[in-house]
Amino acid sequence: MAQTNGVLQEPAITTMNGAPVLKPASTQRIGNQLRATLLLQDINLLELIQHITHERIPERVVHARGTSAHGYFEVTDDISDVTSAAFLNRVGKQTDIFCRFSTVAGRAESAETVRDTRGFAFKMFTEEGNLDWLFLSTPVFPIRDGAKFPSFTHATKKNPRSGLPDHKAFWDYFTHNQEGIHFLMFLFSDRATPVDFQHADIFSINTYKFTKSDGSFTYVKIHLKTNQGVKNFTQDEANQKAGVDPDFQTRSLYEDIENQKYPTWDVFAQIIDPVKAENYHINIFDATKTFPFSEFPLRKFGKITLNRNVDNFFAEQEQSAFSPTNLVPGWALTPDPIIQTRALAYADTQRYRLGANFVQLPVNAPYKKPFTPLIRDGAATVNGNLGGTPNYFPSSFYNVGAATQYAQPDEEQFQGTVVNFESEVVDADYVQPRIFWEKTLAEEPGQQDNLISNVAGHLSAVTGDKGLGSSTSGLCNVR
């Protein structure tokens, strides 16, 4: 837009059908006075009021509080020996990305520096379609049985009667689901109060597969290490910042990018050979566990740089939609029960929030135009709907081009009886939490004391001897 004396010269304001509005702030009424009756024929007023009553969309169930940016992924090291993904096939190759960073439990306007896991979602616009990464700031997840996700979510949110934080429900949940103790210890360390998104490491949580065109595959976990250094608040610092500037982490990321202090992360793959995984003492599909770097070293293959803020917060950040089912050749899901559950939940919640055609929104649309003759119609179809192309397959009236041929990966072999399975907590579930306490935190001065203080502060809101005693039972099992 042109500027006059530093002021943008915009076109005249119009109604939604494009007709000019003479006085946008005026209303049609009988008589030139404030007490006069308004007229229903005032189209501008009708549009303004009817739109504002519909301009909000459903809030995300989790990860409601977030911020976004644009950037790119660059291949830094050759990794073509383990994956045929086209966006990884050449050192120096760059792929545009869009990211959304978030807290997990809080509502859309909640404070950002509170104790919580951070979500890191990346959408990569590759030449073979969009690849979505849905990662977290903790290397482990609180559950490994997908059916527990609703209970975990409810227990970490507010009381259904009072609408207030329910610390007793929180601790009661973890008392009965102690496979989450490893996650719980990360949550009450200073790692769960990062200064901002730029100063946090990022983890895939789930196990994925790298696949090759010859049908071979390896298992992989992804790690992103911040180049800004890891920086965390103490509980008191986080509380103070939440009260003074609840938008601090959004502001920090936005201002860094505006000031060309572009945040970057190095991207690593932790490769796990399928043969070794078969008999390894840790189930590679257990999201509550990590894998030692001494046996499965990190292998660098890329770098992420964020270098552009969004042009419109609602159109991009709020309407962005991510799903682990957004995959490309060379990258695949595994039987990890949590990633399988997430595969169902993410796309489904976006259809609820944004409608059946959320992928057509510019922030979500792949650079390569999809050809989906079997997926048509629905509210807000804006991509031409493939015109008169038959909406069934096969058809005598159009020829479908051949897709690039990829050998079907040699999948895991499964044989058994259908059962209702729920994992059980065993002694091995306390091994890694114990290592985290005795080694990881012990090597960082003051971190063991901070964890104890953070837990004690949270437990102080749990009333009743029974509630307090049962709440600490899981942590006592770590020692």
From Swiss-Prot:
Please give the chief subcellular localization of this protein.
Answer: other
Q: Could you confirm whether the keyword DNA damage appears in this record?
A: no
Q: Note one Pfam family from the annotation.
A: Catalase
Read off the SMART domains from this record: Catalase
Instruction: Specify the enzyme's EC class, one word.
Output: oxidoreductase
What does the UniProt record say this protein does?
Catalyzes the degradation of hydrogen peroxide (H(2)O(2)) generated by peroxisomal oxidases to water and oxygen, thereby protecting cells from the toxic effects of hydrogen peroxide.
* UniProt protein name: Catalase A
Q: Which organism is it from?
A: Botryotinia fuckeliana (Noble rot fungus)
